[in-house]
Amino acid sequence: MKHAEIPPPPDAAAEVFGPALGAARRYAEILAGAGVERGLLGPREVDRIWDRHILNCAVIGELVEAGERVADVGSGAGLPGIPLALARPDVHVVLIEPLLRRSDFLREAIEDVGIECSVVRGRAEDRSVREEVGPTDVVVSRAVASLDKLAKWSSPLLRPGGRMLAIKGERAAEEIEEHRRALAALGVSELKVERCGARFVDPPATVVVGFQATAPEKRPRSGRRQR
């Protein structure tokens, strides 16, 4: 198959990725090559591979703290997890993907690009996946499902006080109102919309942020004396 020509990275990419720019360029080549061949990226997306896909995902690093453990649910072609790992080598990213052909692609991609990510094959809601991944500080996702489903998958992976970051579109605020009650039932609250990367991508990435409730404080039963 003849691969589409990949546009050069915009100037912003050098600032976002720093010394990892070469690795980001290699990832763009993989997406435009094997990613298109395996049906993980549409061929028409190659022309906007930087702004719409790679940079759009990388800039959510603005919402992640150094040293945090991040899980990417339904990672697919590695978006947003791989660009985030490239832009933020100070965090550890786990890519979660249920389909074998996609998880194989992810393993091949991270080895080729040369970044330290983990790949876990399975569904985020599966107990075995939760046990393998362990408690995480942040769960990220992009174009995977509605907010209520994302919260159902993300919540069990998050430590108390952890955050769900979902890259969404123009309806982000409407989705929050539509699913607020369902998210609250799962312990996800303090919902808000953040815009990331205004200096690097136009339009900025739209991210729904939700916080996992902390464990309720245990109090002695009324009438019982503490010892």
Curated annotation (Swiss-Prot):
Q: What is its EC number?
A: 2.1.1.-
Residues the entry annotates as binding S-adenosyl-L-methionine: G74, L79, A124, E125, R142
Keyword DNA-binding included in the entry's annotation: no
Subcellular location, record wording = Cytoplasm
Q: Which Pfam families match?
A: GidB (PF02527)
Query: What GO molecular function annotation could you give as one example from this UniProt entry?
Result: rRNA (guanine-N7-)-methyltransferase activity
Keyword rRNA-binding appears in the UniProt entry: no
Q: What is its main location?
A: cytoplasm
> What keywords is this UniProt entry annotated with?
Cytoplasm, Methyltransferase, rRNA processing, S-adenosyl-L-methionine, Transferase
Superkingdom as given in the UniProt entry:
Bacteria
EC class, as a word, reads: transferase
One cellular component term from this protein's GO annotations in UniProt: cytosol
* Function statement: Specifically methylates the N7 position of guanine in position 518 of 16S rRNA.
Similarity comment: family membership: Belongs to the methyltransferase superfamily. RNA methyltransferase RsmG family.
Protein's UniProt name: Ribosomal RNA small subunit methyltransferase G
Organism of provenance: Mycolicibacterium gilvum (strain PYR-GCK) (Mycobacterium gilvum (strain PYR-GCK))
